[in-house]
């Protein structure tokens, strides 16, 4: 086990720093708040191996999936952002803001991810799709968190995510700072 101490601040910064330290074929984003089921990891790994898939995104909105942590505001926001992601970027995933993700490490590093905040949630799949990588969703069951508090401000972070999506749509280099 390697323990990393985050150098800068921000959700996206922590994830990017972690991905950049991974030396295995695949990486996985797995929250420490107890809301993810580790039993779903094998399913995600099998999808990567069996389907020539590059990234598997856990989804709380597929048949056989659920969320015990969503509020009506986060549900509506996520559905809206997932719709935007699928309509404008043809992502083909059903839960864009849920960062239970497993994917090809080198391909993730090649994306040159920049988002230091929650915009990371949309930057990863959008840049992956723009690079021609294959994305799929896998049913996931989100449990109530056992530790920690949500740091997401639905409206402030939602606006920031929307701005990030607009930048990713209009700017070819997709630079997000």
What is each PLM-predicted segment?
Residues 122:
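DNA-recognition element of transcription regulators
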Residues 163-177:
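C-terminal, non-catalytic tails of nucleotide-sugar-dependent glycosyltransferases
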Residues 30-31, 139:
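Short beta-strand segments
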Residues 56, 95-97, 137, 174-177:
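Short, hydrophobic secondary-structure boundary micro-motifs
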Residues 1-4:
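Acidic donor-binding segment of Leloir-type glycosyltransferases
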Residues 7-21, 26-29, 38-118, 144-162, ...:
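Acceptor/aglycone-binding surface of glycosyltransferases and processive sugar-polymer synthases
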Residues 92, 116, 125-143:
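Catalytic donor-sugar/metal-binding loop of nucleotide-sugar-dependent glycosyltransferases
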Residues 34-36:
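Acidic metal-phosphate-binding loop of nucleotide-sugar-dependent transferases
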């Amino acid at each position: 086990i390697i323990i990393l101490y985050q150098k800068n601040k921000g959700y996206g910064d922590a994830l990017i720093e972690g991905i950049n330290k991974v030396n295995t074929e695949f990486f996985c984003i797995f929250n420490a708040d107890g809301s993810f089921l580790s039993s779903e990891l094998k399913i995600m790994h099998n999808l990567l191996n069996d389907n020539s898939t590059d990234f598997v995104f856990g989804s709380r909105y597929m048949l056989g999936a659920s969320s015990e942590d969503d509020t009506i505001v986060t549900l509506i926001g996520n559905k809206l952002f997932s719709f935007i992601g699928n309509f404008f970027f043809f992502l083909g995933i059903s839960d864009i803001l849920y960062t239970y993700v497993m994917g090809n490490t080198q391909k993730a590093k090649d994306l040159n991810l920049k988002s230091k905040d929650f915009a990371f949630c949309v930057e990863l799949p959008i840049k992956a799709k723009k690079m021609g990588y294959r994305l799929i969703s896998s049913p996931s069951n989100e449990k109530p968190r056992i530790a920690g508090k949500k740091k997401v401000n639905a409206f402030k972070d939602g606006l920031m995510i929307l701005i990030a999506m607009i930048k990713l749509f209009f700017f070819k280099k997709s630079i997000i700072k």
